Curated annotation (Swiss-Prot):
SUPFAM superfamilies the UniProt entry points to: Acetyl-CoA synthetase-like (SSF56801)
GO biological process, one term: fatty acid metabolic process
Membership in a protein family: Belongs to the ATP-dependent AMP-binding enzyme family.
Free-text comment on this protein's domains from its UniProt entry: Both substrate-binding domains (SBD1 and SBD2) are involved in the substrate recognition, and are sufficient to confer the substrate specificity.
Annotated protein name in UniProt: Probable CoA ligase CCL8
Organism: Humulus lupulus
C-alpha cells in the first residue's frame, strides 16, 4: 500500500525564537493512519529490547560522540521514539490549536504506534546524534529513510527529493533555511529534528530525555516487523546518468551489518573515528550501522581533517604503553584520506612524527575502500603505522561482498575473498559462460542485495541475471590464491573520483548548458590522489572562440567553468582538468571512442 505522507499529515516543526522550546511548535497537523504494526529496522530488534530493559548494561553504553558530547544508546532510542511519536501522533494538533504547552508528559503519553506505510522521509543533518535518531525514528514510524547529501547543490537535492517522492524532510537547524526553501518547491513537509540531549545536558525543556525514558511496550510493538519492507533508499553517484535510488530492506540491512560485525570482529569495546559522508554506504554501513549493531561507540568528525585525525589518535594513546578510556580503536577511510594523512605526517617535526606513528600503531584495525588503493600508498602507510590496510569491495547495491581477512594475509592489489554466504561469479565479456580464473564482469548474489532501483523496474530487471546475480559493471579476475582483483569499470563512461562513482554523461549534460560550450567530452584521467580526475574536453562555440582569439585568451578557463558549474554539480563532480579542442574525434556513427581518447591523453599528459 502506497501512502503519501502529505495526505496523511502536514506536520511542520519550525523554530520560534521566543518560545522556550523552539523545536516543539506545530501547524496544520492532520492525523496519520495508525495501523497495528511497526516498522523498526530488524537490526535494532534485539538491541532495542535489551536497551528497554531496566538496568540494562547496553542502555548506559556510549553510542555516539560528537561535538565534545556523548550520547548513550538509551538516549538515542528514547529520542528516536519521540521523533516517531511526532511523526505519527494525532494529539499534537489539538494541543497546539488549544494553545497548550507541549510538555514532556504529553510526549511521553503518545503511543508511537503509527505506521507511515513506507512513506519516504529525507534526513538532512551533519554526522551527529540527530542524524542517527532521525533514521531510527523514521524506521520506528514505518517510514523509509532517505539520507540527503550535504554537499549536493539545490538542483541535485531537488532531483533526489522529487525522484524518491519524499513526503517529509527531517533537518537540523543549520540546514533549515535551505531545506525549507527546497521543501516549498516540492510536496514535502519540513520538520526540525529536536536536539538529542547529551549525557551532561541541562536542557530543562527535555529533561525527560536525560534519563532516557522509553515506552517499552511501544518499542517491543514496533520491533515486530516485516523484514521485507523497504527501510532505506541510498542514491548512487550517478553511474548511468542521473543518480538512481537503491532500495534496501530491513532484511538486507540486517544481513549486511551482521556479516560486517562478525567478519571484522566489532565489539562493545571498539570506538570508531568516523569522518565519512552519510549518504554513502561506506559511511552508513561500515562505520555506523554495523558498529551500532555491535554496541560499539562511533565518534563523529563531521569534516575530514588531517591534523584533527592525527591529534585524536595521539590523544587516545599518549605513550606507547598508555591509552585513555575513550581511545579510538578502528578507522576506515578512502584512499585519498590516507594519501592526505601521509602528507600531513611527512610535514611534522621528528618528535611529532614519533608520537603520531606510535599512536596509530595501537589502533586495532584500519580499513580502506570506495576506490582502488594504490599499492605505494598501502606500503607507505604500513611503513609509518605498521598497519596493512584492510581492503574490501562493495557497491551501493549490495554494500560489501568481498574483503581481505581480519586475520590472515591481506594481499596488496586485491580486495580479498567473498564473505560467507556471498556468491561471486565472473562472466566473460561475450556472456557465453563464466569461470573463476579469467577476466570478466563481476556478478554478485548476496543476502544483502538491494530490493530494486526506485521506480525503475526495467533497469532493475536488466541489472540481474536470470538466476539472481547482480551485474556490477566492474571487471575483475581471481588470482592463484582465490583473491579477487578489480580491474576497473566495464564502461568508459564511469569514473571513480575520491571514492565516488561518477557518470561522465551526467556531467557532460550539465556542461553543455554553458553558452560557451558547443561540444564536450568528459572522462576520468589517472590521478595519484583521487584515483581519477574529472577531465573535460570542450569545443567552444564559434563566437566564444573568436572573442577569445581577439582578446588573446582562452574561450573559457577552468576557473570560469568551475565557478559556473559549482551551482549545478556536487563538488566532487566538478572538472579539475580542461582541454580546449577545435573538434572531437568521432566515428561514422558520431560517437567518441573514450577508451582510445583516454589512452591518448594519458600518454600526452604523462599521467
Amino acid at each position: 500500500m502506497h501512502l503519501n505522507l502529505k495526505s496523511l499529515c502536514s506536520l511542520t516543526l519550525i523554530s520560534q525564537a521566543k518560545t522556550s522550546n523552539p523545536f516543539l511548535s506545530f501547524s496544520n497537523c492532520r492525523p496519520f493512519s495508525s495501523l497495528h504494526s511497526g516498522s523498526a529496522n530488524l537490526i535494532l530488534m534485539e538491541l532495542l529490547k535489551e536497551v528497554a530493559k531496566e538496568g540494562s548494561s547496553a542502555s548506559v553504553g556510549v553510542a555516539i560522540r560528537a561535538d565534545q558530547k556523548s550520547y548513550s544508546y538509551k538516549q538515542l532510542i528514547s529520542s528516536a521514539q519521540r521523533i516517531c511519536s511526532l511523526l505519527c501522533s494525532t494529539d499534537l494538533k489539538a494541543s497546539h490549536k488549544a494553545g497548550k504547552q507541549v510538555t514532556p508528559a504529553l510526549i511521553n503519553g503518545l503511543s508511537g504506534h503509527g505506521h507511515l506505510g513506507g512513506a519516504r522521509v529525507g534526513i538532512v543533518a551533519k554526522p551527529s546524534a540527530e542524524f542517527v535518531t532521525g533514521v531510527l525514528g523514521t524506521w520506528l514510524s514505518g517510514g523509509v529513510a532517505v539520507p540527503l547529501a550535504l554537499s549536493y547543490p539545490e538542483a541535485e537535492l531537488l532531483h533526489v527529493m522529487t525522484d524518491s517522492d519524499i513526503s517529509m524532510i527531517l533537518s537540523t537547524e543549520d540546514h533549515q533555511e535551505l531545506m525549507q526553501k527546497i521543501a516549498a518547491k516540492t510536496a514535502a513537509q519540513f520538520s526540525l529534528i529536536p536536539p538529542v540531549p547529551s549525557s551532561c545536558s541541562q536542557e530543562g525543556a527535555v529533561d525527560h530525555l536525560q534519563t532516557g525514558d522509553i515506552n517499552t511496550d511501544s518499542i517491543l510493538h514496533n520491533t515486530e516487523i516485516s523484514n521485507e519492507n523497504p527501510a532505506l533508499i541510498v542514491y548512487t553517484s550517478g553511474t548511468t546518468g542521473k543518480p538512481k535510488g537503491v532500495v534496501h530492506t530491513h532484511k538486507s540491512i540486517n544481513a549486511q551489518v551482521q556479516t560486517l560485525a562478525k567478519a571484522w570482529e566489532y565489539t562493545p569495546a571498539d570506538q570508531f573515528l568516523h569522518c565519512l559522508p552519510l549518504h554513502h554506504v561506506h559511511g552508513l554501513f561500515n562505520a555506523l550501522f554495523a558498529p551500532l549493531y555491535a554496541r560499539s561507540t562511533v565518534e563523529f568528525m563531521p569534516k575530514f581533517s588531517v591534523r584533527g585525525i592525527w591529534q585524536r589518535w595521539r590523544e587516545s594513546y599518549p605513550t606507547c604503553e598508555t591509552k585513555v578510556d575513550d581511545c579510538i580503536t578502528v578507522f576506515t577511510g578512502v584512499p585519498t584520506m590516507y594519501t592526505r594523512l601521509i602528507q600531513g605526517y611527512e610535514a611534522m617535526d621528528p618528535e611529532l612524527k614519533e608520537a603520531s606513528a606510535s599512536a596509530a600503531k595501537q589502533l586495532r584495525l584500519m580499513m580502506c575502500g570506495s576506490s582502488a588503493l594504490p599499492i605505494p600508498v598501502m606500503q607507505q602507510w604500513q611503513t609509518i603505522t605498521g598497519h596493512r590496510l584492510l581492503e574490501r569491495y562493495g557497491m551501493t547495491e549490495f554494500v560489501m561482498a568481498i574483503s581481505n581477512p581480519l586475520k590472515g594475509e591481506r594481499k596488496a592489489g586485491t580486495v580479498g575473498k567473498p564473505f560467507p554466504g556471498v556468491e561471486v561469479r565472473i562472466v566473460a565479456e561475450d556472456e557465453n559462460g563464466s569461470d573463476t580464473t579469467g577476466v570478466g564482469e563481476l556478478c554478485v548474489r548476496s543476502p544483502s542485495l538491494f530490493k530494486e532501483y526506485w521506480r525503475l523496474p526495467e533497469v532493475t530487471k536488466s541489472s540481474f541475471t536470470d538466476d539472481g546475480f547482480f551485474k556490477t559493471g566492474d571487471a575483475g579476475k581471481v588470482d592463484e590464491d582465490g583473491y579477487y582483483v578489480i580491474l576497473g569499470r566495464t564502461s568508459a563512461d564511469i569514473m571513480k573520483v575520491g571514492g565516488y562513482k561518477l557518470s561522465a554523461l551526467e556531467i557532460e549534460s550539465v556542461l553543455l548548458e554553458h553558452p560557451t560550450v558547443e561540444e564536450c567530452c568528459v572522462l576520468g584521467l589517472p590521478d595519484k590522489d583521487y584515483g581519477e580526475a574529472v577531465s573535460a574536453i570542450i569545443v567552444p562555440a564559434a563566437e566564444a572562440k573568436k572573442k577569445g582569439e581577439e582578446e588573446s585568451k582562452p574561450a573559457i578557463s577552468l576557473e570560469e567553468l568551475f565557478s559556473w558549474a559549482q551551482h549545478k554539480l556536487a563538488p566532487y563532480k566538478l572538472p579539475t582538468r580542461l582541454f580546449l579542442w577545435d573538434s572531437l574525434p568521432r566515428n561514422a556513427m558520431g560517437k567518441v571512442n573514450k577508451k582510445e581518447l583516454k589512452k591518448k591523453l594519458t600518454v600526452e599528459q604523462g599521467v
